[in-house]
Amino acid sequence: TQWGTPYFIAWTTTPWTLPSNTALCVGPKINYVCVQTYNPYNGEKISVVLAESRMSAYFKADGAKIALEDYNPGDKVVPYKVVGKYTGEELVGMRYTQLMPWVKPLEKVDDLAADFVKKVAEEHPERCFTVGTDRFVELEAEGFRVIPGDYVTTDDGTGIVHIAPTFGADDAKVAKAAGIPSLFMINKKGETRPMVDLVGKYYTIDECAPEFVAACVNEENYAHHAGDFVKNAYSPKYNVGGKYDAEAAEKDEDLNIVIC
């Protein structure tokens, strides 16, 4: 029986990379559960998937004794009910909605491109675009899948790992093996770059190639954080005269909190 909106609960120590997410990784041999419960922040009905062995980190034991229908927003103990059990292998291949639909995944189409990239470009020329002399293909339909990864553990987190191929060797390796595209920006020089620039801020739309923006960027969604620094520590606002004001930075709301 459907209970609210279904979610995978993913784990990351770098929330600012979430807009670059293109996959979720599970351990094939890990046991997972589907839990009907409520969002403790807004009281909405939700169904969540996470590793069975990590349930105690997020759900109080008393919650299993309370009927879902008896919950009132604000109650200290949130009720829950386990309604399904799966192995990670059974979850592989499931699709999900892009968490932050700012930019669509894409890849460069050249001799070094993966076979799946070349195939999509050949079968869907309408999804291809050119910046300078380089050809790219938009790959939204090929991303946002659950993929396997033997390195996923249940030592902490949820047993589900957020994958952003442009931020980390492990992410790039497991994504490539599963045929998952990357998500990056293309500047006006035609250079491909991660969403975050070298000074720690999201690229502005004006810095990007117009062909790339037209094909892959949701300007309305992206505009809310374009140009924002991903950590207060990187912002000139807290680095006046070469001196970092740690106290002020810690008091102000950090982007890692804002986007979550």
Q: Model-flagged regions — what are they?
A:
Residues 2-8, 15-260:
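Non-cofactor substrate-recognition interfaces
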